[in-house]
Amino acid sequence: MEDFKMKTLAAFLSLLVLCWAQEEAKLTKANNRFGLRLLRALPSGPEKNVFFSPYSVSAAMGMAFAGARGQTQQELSQGLGFSDVDLTDAGVLDAYTHHTERLKSTPSNSTLDVANAAAIQRTLALLNSYESALQSSFGAELHKVDFAGEPQAAVDFVNNWVKRKTHDKIEKLFNEPLDPDTLLVLLNAIYFKGEWNTAFVKEHTEKRQFFNGGVTPVEVDTMRLEARIKYRFFDDLQVEVVELPYRGLDYTMAILLPKENTGVEGLKQNLTVDRFQNYLSDLRERKITVLLPKFKLETKYSLKAPLQSLGIKQIFESGADLSGINDERLRVSAVEHKAVVEVNEEGTVAAATTGVVIVPYSLGPEPVVFRVDHPFLFFIRNTRTDDIFFVGQVNKL
């Protein structure tokens, strides 16, 4: 009888692990789909680069989702892609719980630090259930501040938290004190540092042409690497794809270079998560020469309008239902996102932070030259979990 009990328990635990893995995979797919949709919604053009962390935005909005109810929660579920992958409301929080723990516990040769926090007006009492969700599902730190009485000290606290969690790569998220009526700021910060598995040799870096906007030639520092790397050209979107691994091989940078100099916008509009994943699965290792510009991007976005264009609307209006946070009538007034990335011969350093402000109411024998000399897309991802942590579009250098 005891032997039967043990077998039953083991089977039950295995089933739980399988369910958790399935929920995490759904969350990753939802976040990645959301990232591509947000990429299309953000302003871009020949003179404007794009860089952001879909994971950071999704995590911050996920903390708002935990306190949303009714239509507000439904819009978030649809806009963030949860409903598209059949994630239930409870399933979202369970998936975040186990995914957050796995990212923290998985050993890696690269550095990935993800942190969540809530800066809470000291007079605001959060519902116990919401505090529990923030801490258990997101590992969030809870901090009391005084946006009304000590606005400068409050914003300084938020900015110092951001600076610390991004290893000083982002100095501040907010340039001035927030509205004194602010009751809650939900924060996510993400920092990545990875060394190339095969480093570019500094002595091989030299000035080469890059066509800004696909048409205007400029001379930029361009790195050179000859190695066996995963590569392929895909006819459907007329795009070359290279995947550059970081040391340890658990993180990579995938670079998508359209054949046409001005083809990046069309590529962006037609790229889907499934197509992206299929591209990566179909890559083949071969000897190639990579010519990649060194670059550093710094971006800041107010995400209210882009999120509204994705159908997330009511949370910003007076009729928002955030009754899972507190009994008061609350609404989100702003979603601010800041990101920075630097790519050089050694590797990549990237960081991003999001703040949600809540107020009342083909293979061949010949070597290939992968010449990145015109606008392109890039993605920094985890090969174990398939999470896309950072997305960029380089139009101008």
Curated annotation (Swiss-Prot):
Residues 1-21 form the signal peptide. SMART domains: SERPIN (SM00093). One of its GO terms (biological process) is immune system process. Glycans are attached at residues 109, 270. PROSITE patterns: SERPIN. It is found in: Secreted. InterPro entries: Serpin_CS, Serpin_dom, Serpin_fam, Serpin_sf, Serpin_sf_1, Serpin_sf_2. Female salivary gland. Ovary. Midgut. GO terms for molecular function: serine-type endopeptidase inhibitor activity; toxin activity. GO terms for cellular component: extracellular space. Induction: Induced by blood feeding. Keywords: Glycoprotein, Hemostasis impairing toxin, Immunity, Platelet aggregation inhibiting toxin, Protease inhibitor, Secreted, Serine protease inhibitor, Signal, Toxin. Belongs to the serpin family. Serine protease inhibitor that modulates blood feeding of ticks on vertebrate species. Inhibits host trypsin, thrombin (F2), alpha-chymotrypsin, cathepsin G (CTSG) and mast cell chymase (CMA1). Inhibits host cathepsin G- and thrombin-induced platelet aggregation. Inhibits acute inflammation in the host. Suppresses neutrophil recruitment in inflamed area. Does not inhibit host plasmin (PLG), factor Xa (F10), factor XIa (F11), elastase and proteinase 3/myeloblastin (PRTN3). Interacts with mouse MCPT4. This is Iripin-2. It comes from Ixodes ricinus. The lineage of its organism: Eukaryota, Metazoa, Ecdysozoa, Arthropoda, Chelicerata.
